[in-house]
A protein has these predicted regions:
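Intrinsic-disorder/low-complexity peptide segments enriched for small residues
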Residues: 10-13, 55
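Catalytic cores of DNA base-excision repair glycosylases
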Residues: 18-20, 26-187
Length: 187
């Protein structure tokens, strides 16, 4: 398979010989600056909109989320609006995303956040993990992207990159093993 970005491929090939975390991070940053996509949820620290994007991105292509996300946020701009909406309105707004159970979980989550937390998403990853539609990885993503807290998590796509470079011959690699090998010290 041919590489579209020759300079990156040469650097990646060198890196595979003796990968260091610092080299790897630099290379990923350089690649992102050159080829990263401008996505609306990357331009906010709002916990609600980050939560919506994280749940939408579960098993759904970025392009589809990119079109549905602004529509959903415009229709339900906060937890109170989502909690007050009818189930049929939420499912209708979700149409085309697949897995309607995610929309139903978001509605239930919004109701809980309004009832128990006054419409403010908790800053505790264990509480987040206990809410409908949120697993540990989503809780960590919210902690990192909304609250600026260093919580390590392995996203599916970057997981493949980590395994490719740091565990090229391994058949099965746990997230814990990846984190030990590649995670920078948390501040």
């Amino acid at each position: 398979r041919k590489c579209k970005h020759a300079s990156v491929c040469i650097s990646l090939t060198r890196l595979k010989i003796n990968p260091s975390r610092a080299q790897f991070r630099r290379l990923i940053r350089v690649y992102y600056r050159a080829h990263g996509r401008d996505l609306a949820w990357r331009r906010t620290r709002d916990p609600y909109t980050i939560l919506i994007s994280e749940v939408m991105l579960q098993q759904t292509q970025v392009e589809r989320v990119g079109t549905k996300y602004p529509e959903f946020i415009a229709r339900f701009p906060n937890f109170r609006a989502l909690a007050a909406a009818s189930v049929s309105d939420v499912v209708s707004a979700w149409q085309g995303m697949g897995y309607n159970r995610r929309a139903l979980a978001l509605k239930r989550l919004a109701e809980i956040v309004v009832e128990r937390y006054g419409g403010v998403l908790p800053k505790d990853p264990k509480i987040l993990d206990s809410l409908p539609g949120i697993g540990w990885a989503t809780a960590c993503a919210i902690m990192a992207f909304a609250y600026g807290r260093a919580f390590p998590f392995i996203e599916t796509n970057i997981r493949r990159v980590f395994i490719h470079f740091f565990f090229p011959r391994a058949r099965k690699v746990s997230d814990a093993k990846i984190l030990v090998r590649v995670a920078a010290p948390l501040d």
